[in-house]
Curated annotation (Swiss-Prot):
Sequence motif NDxxSxxxD/E motif, residues: 220-228
Catalytic activity: (2E,6E)-farnesyl diphosphate = (2S,3R,6S,9S)-(-)-protoillud-7-ene + diphosphate
UniProt superkingdom: Eukaryota
Gene Ontology biological process terms from the UniProt entry: terpene biosynthetic process
GO MF, one example: terpene synthase activity
Protein known as: Terpene synthase 1
Enzyme class of the recorded protein, top EC level: lyase
Family of this protein: Belongs to the terpene synthase family.
Matching PANTHER family: TERPENE SYNTHASE, TERPENE SYNTHASE 2-RELATED
Function: Terpene synthase that converts its substrate farnesyl diphosphate (FPP) into the sesquiterpene protoillud-7-ene.
Keyword Protein transport: no
Classification via InterPro entries: Isoprenoid_synthase_dom_sf, Terpene_cyclase-like_2
């Protein structure tokens, strides 16, 4: 039996999920836009699973921002899952991608807009209003990160046509495809900051984002392993393809991934220290708070991903190779707290 607790993060990355109620509000939006079907139990379960991520990624924000985080999660999963399902041919998939890019770049909706397009449009307009004219560069970074994610979906899905990739190529593609960058740029939208805009183009900051994105990717691959293998999608899961490429057994493959995660965490910590030293002295307490809000968000993307994975029915199962993802483990933890 494997344990996700083999993965070690700094203690100050721990979090308590945001207690604010917002999931039902976003669900009503999903119904309004036709993303979900009324009174459909499967849709309700799917919604609760994916939108609940927001409270782990943004544990300290207010209701308005938590809803926006929930809308981002709703958009991610409903748009990406449709393209991943294989129901569209290449021509149709490309059309869907181009339409969604136009939603974000041009701020336009077609008359026959899909549910995910409507969700994306609403989030875009909220970000535009929140940024205003003064923070147009923040808004542009958010739009750019969303369009890059949109454009990554088809190429990443095509990788498996040539068999499992090497981990270096996989990580290079997946760090965009995992969707971490839009989360980070949305966090910048959340703070009404007066920080020097050159901070966000710092090579240290960019590298920190890459480190976090790769770690989030590897954690996601671990927890989704059983589901993807059962769905014949293991070719793009390192825990699976390490076993095929390197003739590892499952525990050895897992240990290799844990070592990779620890490498990128340590690289992140070194870059974060260097990044903080490179900053000009803060002019006021608000500037310092804003920088540390952004750093905490990077930390929470990792620790929140693992915490969410241990309790979501999307991946938890009685036969999971990870003890923390078996219902019996979660029930035992609950009983011990009573």
């Amino acid at each position: 039996m494997l344990s996700l607790n083999e993965i070690k993060f700094p203690v100050h990355w721990n979090l308590k999920p945001n207690p604010t109620s917002y999931v039902d509000h976003v669900y009503q939006e999903g119904l309004e836009f036709g993303v979900w079907r009324p009174d459909n139990k499967r849709d309700i379960v799917a919604h609760n699973n994916v939108v609940s991520l927001s409270k782990f990624f943004w544990p300290t924000v207010d209701f308005e921002r938590l809803v926006m985080g929930g809308e981002l999660m709703l958009w991610f999963f409903t748009f990406d899952d449709a393209l991943d399902s294989g129901i569209y041919d290449d021509t149709k998939s490309l059309e869907i991608v181009r339409r969604m890019s136009a939603v974000f770049m041009e701020g336009t909706l077609c008359d026959d807009a899909s549910g995910p397009e409507k969700v994306g449009y609403r989030l875009r307009q909220k970000c535009l209003e929140m940024c205003g004219k003064r923070r147009r560069d923040t808004f542009n970074r958010f739009i750019t990160s969303c369009v890059q994610w949109i454009d990554s979906i088809i190429p990443f899905n095509k990788v498996k046509d040539g068999g499992s990739p090497h981990i270096e190529l996989y990580s290079f593609l997946r760090k965009i495809n995992i969707g971490a960058y839009p989360c980070v740029t949305l966090s910048e939208v959340f703070i009404d900051h007066y920080l020097d805009h050159s901070i966000w183009s710092s090579p240290r900051w960019v590298k920190m984002n890459e480190n976090i994105a790769i770690v989030v990717t590897l954690i996601n691959d671990l927890v989704s392993y059983e589901k993807e293998v059962n769905d014949n999608a293991g070719a793009l899961n390192p825990l699976y393809f390490f076993q095929q490429q390197r003739k590892f057994n499952l525990p050895d493959s897992y240990n290799h991934m844990v070592n990779l995660i620890h490498f990128f965490v340590q690289d992140y910590l070194a870059n974060e220290e260097s990044f903080l030293k490179s900053l000009e002295p803060f002019e006021n307490e608000k500037q310092q708070q804003d920088i540390y809000f952004m750093l905490d968000h990077l930390h929470f993307l990792i620790s929140g991903s693992r915490m969410w994975s241990m309790q979501t029915p999307r991946y938890c199962s009685p036969t999971s190779p990870f003890i923390e993802m078996r219902p019996s483990f979660n029930q035992g933890n609950l009983m011990s707290k009573l």
